[in-house]
Amino acid sequence: MLRMAPKTVGAVRNLNIHEWQSKQLIQKYGGRAQSGEVAFSPERSRDIAKKLWNQFPGCKFVVKAQVLAGGRGKGHWEHGMQGGVKLAKTPEEVYEIANEMIGHKLITKQTGAKGINCNKVMVCGAVKILKEFYLSILLDRAMGCPVIIATSQGGMGIEEVAQKCPECLFKVPISVKNGPTNEQLVKLAKDLGLEGDLVQDCVDNVKALYQVFDKCDSTMVEINPLGVIETPTDEKVICCLDAKIAFDKDAAFRQKEIFALRDKSREDPRDVRASLADLNYVGLDGDIGCMVNGAGLAMATMDTINYFGGSAANFLDVGGNAKKEQITEALRILNSDKHVKSILINIFGGIMRCDVVAQGIMDAVREMKLDLPLVVRLEGTNVAKGKEILKSSGLNIIPANDLGDAAKKAVASLKH
């Protein structure tokens, strides 16, 4: 029985934007979100805090690291400071916290041990939070429709809630054609324990969040926490205190304004290169680079490598109809990863022709003067031509007969 390969560290079909951008989008569609300003330097963060201090003397502040990763609150910094969301009492404290965040790495459950570099923070006025909830809208493929998931256990990881208290989760299936009904949202608000005017306020805000989900081709809108806060005028209102929104990359052609928000400087350079070449790539922590056509075959390849004692350095799906140039770029990406010590190419040619793959491999190996062990398994359309191209190339390529053979040879190549 195969052992499962390590869990991937990111999605390959989504665009993710920062919290401050997500909140602006929510406000655009009529939702209430905690406002704040972004600072790229500690000095700017102090200036923002001073401006708030002048408007609301004696107010407190929240400094939030702007990184494309969840779990900030429970994360820690490379230099030891705890938390990517910190409370400050004065503008000078805001400066000191921002100085510990900007230019440093934040490590969370989602970033792995390497962490992620922070180059900006969001400075907000602190608010009095009376209650916290979790709410998300996402696609449920099993149900074939969008689903609202909510719980009164806000501020926690939803996975933790689902494990410890599954009965605390509320799921509301939504009609794709009509969207959420008032009856559905009123019931949800009451299930969350809201009363009086807060029920309708919750309904209005969830409707706004669904507009973001629907109109912007979102794959996920996650608010954690969604809070009941007390305003300076002692009014109790619903407010999005944090926001994470992801978008379907296939919608880029009609969501140009949103996709212009993409922060490539915060992404793995390999991810950016793969995206530009229309390749599906996710970096992992192993040392065997993989290039495969088809997500299912890619997962099977990673599992088989793991079964034979190896560890995949990536998930890389070149798709079912890759051109020679894409094959070449895929190999360049693998070769650029300093952790990769061996490469396994596993291609099953249906629409894709094995001779095209072989030509791309040969061109890339010669161009890069690749000196890593390279194991190639080809099967399918024009496989004989493909194998002949590789055999006659004179290159040091290790042929494999099947997936198991390829995985064993890739793992063995690390020992030579």
Swiss-Prot record:
<dbReference type="InterPro" id="IPR013815">
    <property type="entry name" value="ATP_grasp_subdomain_1"/>
</dbReference>
<dbReference type="InterPro" id="IPR005809">
    <property type="entry name" value="Succ_CoA_ligase-like_bsu"/>
</dbReference>
<dbReference type="GO" id="GO:0042709">
    <property type="term" value="C:succinate-CoA ligase complex"/>
</dbReference>
<dbReference type="InterPro" id="IPR017866">
    <property type="entry name" value="Succ-CoA_synthase_bsu_CS"/>
</dbReference>
<protein>
    <recommendedName>
        <fullName>Succinate--CoA ligase [ADP-forming] subunit beta</fullName>
        <ecNumber>6.2.1.5</ecNumber>
    </recommendedName>
</protein>
<dbReference type="GO" id="GO:0006104">
    <property type="term" value="P:succinyl-CoA metabolic process"/>
</dbReference>
<keyword id="KW-0816">Tricarboxylic acid cycle</keyword>
<feature type="binding site">
    <location>
        <begin position="71"/>
        <end position="73"/>
    </location>
    <ligand>
        <name>ATP</name>
    </ligand>
</feature>
<keyword id="KW-0377">Hydrogenosome</keyword>
<comment type="subunit">
    <text>Heterodimer of an alpha and a beta subunit.</text>
</comment>
<feature type="binding site">
    <location>
        <position position="293"/>
    </location>
    <ligand>
        <name>substrate</name>
    </ligand>
</feature>
<feature type="site" description="Important for substrate specificity">
    <location>
        <position position="128"/>
    </location>
</feature>
<dbReference type="InterPro" id="IPR016102">
    <property type="entry name" value="Succinyl-CoA_synth-like"/>
</dbReference>
<feature type="transit peptide" description="Hydrogenosome">
    <location>
        <begin position="1"/>
        <end position="14"/>
    </location>
</feature>
<dbReference type="InterPro" id="IPR013650">
    <property type="entry name" value="ATP-grasp_succ-CoA_synth-type"/>
</dbReference>
<dbReference type="GO" id="GO:0042566">
    <property type="term" value="C:hydrogenosome"/>
</dbReference>
<dbReference type="GO" id="GO:0000287">
    <property type="term" value="F:magnesium ion binding"/>
</dbReference>
<dbReference type="Pfam" id="PF08442">
    <property type="entry name" value="ATP-grasp_2"/>
</dbReference>
<dbReference type="GO" id="GO:0006099">
    <property type="term" value="P:tricarboxylic acid cycle"/>
</dbReference>
<feature type="binding site">
    <location>
        <begin position="350"/>
        <end position="352"/>
    </location>
    <ligand>
        <name>substrate</name>
    </ligand>
</feature>
<dbReference type="GO" id="GO:0005524">
    <property type="term" value="F:ATP binding"/>
</dbReference>
<feature type="binding site">
    <location>
        <position position="132"/>
    </location>
    <ligand>
        <name>ATP</name>
    </ligand>
</feature>
<dbReference type="GO" id="GO:0005739">
    <property type="term" value="C:mitochondrion"/>
</dbReference>
<dbReference type="Pfam" id="PF00549">
    <property type="entry name" value="Ligase_CoA"/>
</dbReference>
<keyword id="KW-0547">Nucleotide-binding</keyword>
<dbReference type="GO" id="GO:0004775">
    <property type="term" value="F:succinate-CoA ligase (ADP-forming) activity"/>
</dbReference>
<keyword id="KW-0460">Magnesium</keyword>
<keyword id="KW-0067">ATP-binding</keyword>
<feature type="binding site">
    <location>
        <position position="64"/>
    </location>
    <ligand>
        <name>ATP</name>
    </ligand>
</feature>
<feature type="binding site">
    <location>
        <position position="242"/>
    </location>
    <ligand>
        <name>Mg(2+)</name>
    </ligand>
</feature>
<feature type="binding site">
    <location>
        <position position="224"/>
    </location>
    <ligand>
        <name>Mg(2+)</name>
    </ligand>
</feature>
<comment type="pathway">
    <text>Carbohydrate metabolism; tricarboxylic acid cycle; succinate from succinyl-CoA (ligase route): step 1/1.</text>
</comment>
<dbReference type="InterPro" id="IPR005811">
    <property type="entry name" value="SUCC_ACL_C"/>
</dbReference>
<keyword id="KW-0479">Metal-binding</keyword>
<comment type="similarity">
    <text>Belongs to the succinate/malate CoA ligase beta subunit family.</text>
</comment>
<feature type="site" description="Important for substrate specificity">
    <location>
        <position position="60"/>
    </location>
</feature>
<keyword id="KW-0436">Ligase</keyword>
<comment type="function">
    <text>Succinyl-CoA synthetase functions in the citric acid cycle (TCA), coupling the hydrolysis of succinyl-CoA to the synthesis of ATP and thus represents the only step of substrate-level phosphorylation in the TCA. The beta subunit provides nucleotide specificity of the enzyme and binds the substrate succinate, while the binding sites for coenzyme A and phosphate are found in the alpha subunit.</text>
</comment>
<keyword id="KW-0809">Transit peptide</keyword>
